[in-house]
Amino acid sequence: MEKIVLLLAIVSLVKSDQICIGYHANNSTEQVDTIMEKNVTVTHAQDILEKTHNGKLCDLNGVKPLILRDCSVAGWLLGNPMCDEFINVPEWSYIVEKASPANDLCYPGDFNDYEELKHLLSRTNHFEKIQIIPKSSWSNHDASSGVSSACPYHGRSSFFRNVVWLIKKNSAYPTIKRSYNNTNQEDLLVLWGIHHPNDAAEQTKLYQNPTTYISVGTSTLNQRLVPEIATRPKVNGQSGRMEFFWTILKPNDAINFESNGNFIAPEYAYKIVKKGDSAIMKSELEYGNCNTKCQTPMGAINSSMPFHNIHPLTIGECPKYVKSNRLVLATGLRNTPQRERRRKKRGLFGAIAGFIEGGWQGMVDGWYGYHHSNEQGSGYAADKESTQKAIDGVTNKVNSIIDKMNTQFEAVGREFNNLERRIENLNKQMEDGFLDVWTYNAELLVLMENERTLDFHDSNVKNLYDKVRLQLRDNAKELGNGCFEFYHKCDNECMESVKNGTYDYPQYSEEARLNREEISGVKLESMGTYQILSIYSTVASSLALAIMVAGLSLWMCSNGSLQCRICI
């Protein structure tokens, strides 16, 4: 009879109403890394590293770049005859120069402080070319014969368009004294040069005077140049050399030239009409008729991500360059579908990765929620409040990370002349060091935030579990797997009250107490029955053993195998 009662009690326990706390799972295979683990599969993740570009040169915020094609910056500014398409250029967003442009200084020589001039251009968006000393004004000098086969144009000798190579006229080279006053409101870029002949014969042939000089002065510049006559190997068919110089003439300032030979005079100058962020970018790409906010030598980036790994040199509103190959932020939960039935490592709070062994793919409308079963059926229901708070929290955190990191960031190349190689090497080492620090910071940030996000989800599930536990108290039994088994009947209305936090503990406490005591009584009665049976079994076994020993002894005494002596 006791066994039948026990069996009925067990059956009734199996059919008891239950409510479980759980979390969302899906078919996602996205993985993230944390401080403690690698390749953690999560339900949702967000990539914050841009790895793609369009492979084109694009307008930057609607403004076209100045693509110099086969011309260098020097060829453009001095007016190499092969660069006539750049005689007048509109506003540019950035300048593109090939690594080794064919049309540079056609007449061999050097451009003084060339790298510094390029740095100036990286803060300029528009030049306006103006004539400052007309070519026709050199009545006492030959301003037409100063051409060279090194600078051909349509098969004939020519020269730079923006400067004038002055030669003697009628066997005389009178001393030049010229001035130009900058009456413009803008700064003016002025260029001039000096010719270094191959020998003394060439010197007198071109300039008549054997000893010459060039003097240039402004309010901030005091320069005196003399030609260096020397025998040199031919470059572009020329043994002579030309050296070019430049200065920025401020408004209301004047520039004065004095020379008795070897003078390359300015005809045109460049009015700096607009200053702003620009860059000189080394690239072999072609124009792609596109628009972007961020340009690299590899192509344009159109992305809202805070990091990229495409190229360290950029112009525009760009993500920060890092050397990483993967930066993924966890936004969802650990993805542990219940069917896997395997225990994961514990998180900080141990909820998702601890006593709740698997997520629910059937719960699709929230991150956390409930599964109930009673006589009316079973089903999943998301906890909208905790889910929305979690979504808001994670979204705000991701946006905050992106906002903090996704500031305007430009990294343009710096150029150094041959005398500055040690500075260039030091600059490269510093830039590499900065990139290493940025990369380390970005990777560490992602690892820490992923750990915090997953623990945040663990904590939310634990909080939801505690919310239910505190409501039910002893009206239900904790099963240890995230579920509670009611000691009373709990219909759908009762289940809903547990979910929304309005469960009426006193209403069900009496029924729960009676059922709890009945179950406890069955257990105790069963335990007592088994104890009595155990005692009876022990006594009976001992008595049977004693009888067997006595019978064996009498039999052995009767056949002489055992001698029995009774002493009184």
Swiss-Prot record:
Topology Cytoplasmic: residue spans: 553-568
Lipidation (S-palmitoyl cysteine): 557, 564, 567
UniProt KW keywords: Clathrin- and caveolin-independent endocytosis of virus by host, Clathrin-mediated endocytosis of virus by host, Disulfide bond, Fusion of virus membrane with host endosomal membrane, Fusion of virus membrane with host membrane, Glycoprotein, Hemagglutinin, Host cell membrane, Host membrane, Host-virus interaction, Lipoprotein, Membrane, Palmitate, Signal, Transmembrane, Transmembrane helix, Viral attachment to host cell, Viral envelope protein, Viral penetration into host cytoplasm, Virion, Virus endocytosis by host, Virus entry into host cell
Secretion signal span: 1-16
Molecular function in Gene Ontology: host cell surface receptor binding
GO cellular component: host cell plasma membrane; membrane; viral envelope; virion membrane
Residues bearing attached sugar chains per UniProt: 26-27, 39, 181, 302, 500
Domain of life: Viruses
Membrane topology: Single-pass type I membrane protein
Extracellular side stretches: 17-531
Membrane-spanning ranges: 532-552
Disulfide cross-links: 20-483, 58-290, 71-83, 106-151, 294-318, 490-494
GO BP term, example: viral budding from plasma membrane
One Pfam family, short name: Hemagglutinin
Site feature Cleavage, where: 346-347
Localization, UniProt: Virion membrane; Host apical cell membrane
Record's comment on post-translational modification: Palmitoylated.
Subunit structure and binding partners: Homotrimer of disulfide-linked HA1-HA2.
Miscellaneous: Major glycoprotein, comprises over 80% of the envelope proteins present in virus particle. The extent of infection into host organism is determined by HA. Influenza viruses bud from the apical surface of polarized epithelial cells (e.g. bronchial epithelial cells) into lumen of lungs and are therefore usually pneumotropic. The reason is that HA is cleaved by tryptase clara which is restricted to lungs. However, HAs of H5 and H7 pantropic avian viruses subtypes can be cleaved by furin and subtilisin-type enzymes, allowing the virus to grow in other organs than lungs.
Family: Belongs to the influenza viruses hemagglutinin family.
Reported function: Binds to sialic acid-containing receptors on the cell surface, bringing about the attachment of the virus particle to the cell. This attachment induces virion internalization either through clathrin-dependent endocytosis or through clathrin- and caveolin-independent pathway. Plays a major role in the determination of host range restriction and virulence. Class I viral fusion protein. Responsible for penetration of the virus into the cell cytoplasm by mediating the fusion of the membrane of the endocytosed virus particle with the endosomal membrane.
Protein name, per record: Hemagglutinin
Organism: Influenza A virus (strain A/Goose/Guangdong/1/1996 H5N1 genotype Gs/Gd)
Gene for this chain: HA
